[in-house]
C-alpha cells in the first residue's frame, strides 16, 4: 500500500531562520513565494513615503516606522509572512524601549505597499485582505504609474487619491497629510 505524504508547510519561525540567498521572498500559506525584483524607482518611492511618515511620527512621538520589506506574520496555520514596503507601529502596539526580536508580536496600524507593473490586482487584493485580517487598520497601495494611492480599511469602501489630492490617515496618524503628487517628485 502506498503512503500519502502530507504537504510540508513552513511556520513563520522556520521561514525566519532560512538564509535569504539573495532572493526576495514571502511565506504564503506555509509556502515560499519568490517575488519579482524591485527596480531603483521602487526604492525611491519607498524612501519618499518612509521619510515623510518617519519625520511626522518622530516629531509627534507616535511610534515607529519600518520599511524595506521587514516581515510581519499575517496569518497562522498555515503561516504567512508578508514584507510590507513601509509600516507604522504605534507605541500602543509596540511599546517604547528595546525592540522585540524576530517578527514583532503585534501588527502595524498602517501598511504601505508600492505597486510595480508586474503586480496584479487579484494578488494585491489578496494581500490587502491578509493585512486587514491581521488587525492592520489601513492599507495604502501606492501606484506610481498612475500617480494614485488606493486606501483600504476593513470598515469602509476603498478610497482613491489622485495626484492633486491630500492623502491623510486620520484613523492612525491624526494630522498627517501630504499631496499625493509629492510622493512622485
Give each language-model segment a name:
Residues 1-185:
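Gly/Pro/Ser/Thr-rich low-complexity, intrinsically disordered segments predominantly at protein N-termini
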Amino acid at each position: 500500500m502506498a503512503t500519502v505524504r502530507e504537504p510540508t508547510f513552513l511556520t513563520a519561525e522556520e521561514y525566519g531562520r532560512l538564509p535569504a540567498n539573495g532572493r526576495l521572498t514571502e511565506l504564503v500559506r506555509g509556502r515560499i513565494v519568490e517575488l519579482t525584483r524591485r527596480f531603483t524607482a521602487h526604492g525611491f518611492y519607498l524612501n519618499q513615503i518612509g521619510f515623510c511618515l518617519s519625520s511626522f511620527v518622530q516629531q509627534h512621538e507616535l511610534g515607529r516606522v519600518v520599511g524595506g520589506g521587514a516581515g510581519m506574520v499575517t496569518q497562522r496555520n498555515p503561516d504567512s509572512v508578508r514584507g510590507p514596503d513601509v509600516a507604522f507601529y504605534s507605541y500602543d502596539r509596540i511599546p517604547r524601549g528595546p525592540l522585540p526580536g524576530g517578527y514583532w508580536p503585534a501588527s502595524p496600524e498602517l501598511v504601505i505597499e508600492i505597486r510595480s507593473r508586474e503586480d496584479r490586482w487579484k494578488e494585491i487584493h489578496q494581500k490587502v485582505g491578509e493585512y486587514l485580517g491581521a488587525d492592520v487598520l489601513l492599507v495604502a497601495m501606492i501606484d506610481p504609474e498612475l500617480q494614485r494611492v488606493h486606501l483600504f480599511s476593513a470598515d469602509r469602501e476603498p478610497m482613491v487619491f489622485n495626484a492633486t489630492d491630500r492623502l491623510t490617515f486620520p484613523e492612525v496618524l491624526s494630522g498627517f497629510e501630504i499631496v499625493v503628487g509629492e510622493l512622485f517628485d
